[in-house]
């Protein structure tokens, strides 16, 4: 289904973090000059957008790049929550024509019900890969997250191009076992964990989100079992404002794990 064959090798992808915050960041209370995280979203090579949330155009405007999404013809949606999916953002992206949205069928219905038109929808089934016209292979993996729409599979993604790939693991609590098996098979060159919780013992959000102690446990297994590539780089996104201190504190907390917390506007090469 919509699968093309590409034989590129040694393709380096660039991932731009458009937002790195969880849903408790209030953009209406942002203070100019103070550190702020938008809702989590990412852009691959200025071509593939992951999660068209309500803050993506604010990122472009505040950074003086109003044409940032000019070449975006593919959008991949992890799940239906409002900090990750915004119908008005999709409509603006679709205005130029030729937009394809890769998502769970329940997400497609939500967007259609919100009046999104002029878009090609490609339904995603966990672990059945699809390839965009630009040659990005999207491997949808099951995530451990909720609540969700009736019948919705919430997703994480492995994004591949050529022989390079990365795992985008938000939103999710403990990584699902079948998703772990696919990570071991693909051996991604980078992993983006979500880190909503920070250190929150006794917080039941751990059943759908991730904190630093959970990342430490999963990382130990990933490295011991040679899941991601041996030289893989590890990052975090989706940090809650109310469950973390400063970004500098988070840098220090994650340093012993050799994990880098992302910030809005950060670029990495995969």
Predicted regions and their residues:
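Pre-active-site segment of Zn-dependent metallo-hydrolases
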Residues: 23-80, 86-92, 177-183
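Short, Lys/Arg-enriched N-terminal segments with co-localized hydrophobic residues
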Residues: 2-12
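Active-site-proximal beta-strand elements of phosphoester/diester hydrolases
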Residues: 14-20, 49-51, 136-144, 165-172
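Active-site HxH/HxHxD metal-binding segment of metal-dependent hydrolases
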Residues: 64-125
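Short active-site oxyanion
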Residues: 46-48, 95-100, 165-166
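Active-site neighborhood of phospho(di)ester-bond hydrolases with catalytic His/Asp-centered motifs
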Residues: 49-53, 71-83, 87, 102-105, ...
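Cap/insert and terminal regions of metallo-dependent hydrolase folds
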Residues: 175-269
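Metallo-beta-lactamase
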Residues: 103-155, 160-162, 259-268
């Amino acid at each position: 289904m919509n699968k093309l064959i590409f034989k590129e090798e040694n393709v380096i992808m660039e991932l731009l973090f458009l937002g790195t915050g969880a849903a408790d960041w209030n953009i209406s209370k942002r203070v100019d000059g103070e550190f702020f995280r938008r809702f989590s979203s990412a852009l691959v090579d200025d071509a593939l957008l992951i999660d068209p949330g309500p803050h993506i155009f604010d990122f472009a405007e505040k950074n003086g790049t109003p044409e940032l999404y000019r070449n975006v013809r593919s959008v991949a949606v992890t799940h239906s929550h409002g900090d990750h999916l915004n119908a008005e953002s999709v409509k603006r992206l679709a205005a130029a024509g030729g937009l394809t949205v890769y998502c769970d069928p329940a997400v497609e219905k939500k967007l259609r019900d919100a009046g999104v038109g002029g878009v090609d929808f490609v339904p995603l089934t966990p672990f059945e890969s699809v390839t965009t016209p630009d040659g990005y292979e999207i491997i949808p993996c099951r995530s451990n997250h909720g609540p969700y729409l009736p019948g919705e599979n919430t997703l994480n993604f492995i994004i591949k191009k050529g022989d390079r790939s990365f795992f985008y693991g938000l939103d999710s609590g403990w990584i699902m076992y079948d998703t772990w098996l696919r990570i071991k098979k693909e051996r991604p060159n980078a992993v983006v964990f979500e880190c909503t919780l920070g250190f929150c013992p006794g917080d039941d959000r751990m059943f759908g989100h991730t904190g630093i102690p959970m990342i430490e446990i999963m990382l130990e297994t990933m490295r011991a079992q040679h899941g991601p590539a041996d030289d893989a780089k590890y990052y975090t996104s989706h940090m809650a404002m109310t469950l973390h201190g400063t970004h500098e504190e988070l840098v220090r907390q994650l340093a012993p794990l050799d994990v880098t917390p992302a910030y809005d506007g950060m670029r990495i090469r995969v």
